[in-house]
Amino acid sequence: MSKIDSIIEMIEGLNVLELVELKKKMEEKWGVTAAAPVMAMGAAMPVAAAGDGAAAAAPVEEKTEFDVILKEAGPNKIQVIKVVRELTSLGLKEAKDLVEGAPKPVREGVSKEEAEAAKAKLTEAGAVVEIK
């Protein structure tokens, strides 16, 4: 029998209070925690309480405002500048600076439909676009 197997057998023989004490001592000794890792940006779904049973999950908020981000102008920079001017009402110099300074937001806080339309126009002109 290996050391690991004998340790497992010893742990199996412990009661709940002894297991809690073992956990605390391991956390103190090695500076670790037995807590479950927390997922970033709310990726983990909320879990219903054990005794509750009828607890509903929190409703997921649907995003209503989107940003259109120009990642790169692509080979047709002049066409992209024209589309940026059309979408933003910027002057020629400002639109050129925006396109050359990519990645930059072209439209911010717009509806999904407006964001999709802007992305379609920019992509048609040869730009690489992302909606956030």
UniProtKB/Swiss-Prot annotation:
Cited Pfam families: Ribosomal_L12, Ribosomal_L12_N
UniProt xrefs under InterPro entries: Ribosomal_bL12, Ribosomal_bL12_C, Ribosomal_bL12_C/ClpS-like, Ribosomal_bL12_oligo, Ribosomal_bL12_oligo_N_sf
Keyword Protease recorded: no
GO molecular function: mRNA binding; structural constituent of ribosome
Keyword Ribonucleoprotein: yes
GO cellular component: cytosolic large ribosomal subunit
Subunit structure: Homodimer. Part of the ribosomal stalk of the 50S ribosomal subunit. Forms a multimeric L10(L12)X complex, where L10 forms an elongated spine to which 2 to 4 L12 dimers bind in a sequential fashion. Binds GTP-bound translation factors.
Name of the featured protein: Large ribosomal subunit protein bL12
Source taxonomy: Bacteria, Bacillati, Chloroflexota, Chloroflexia, Chloroflexales
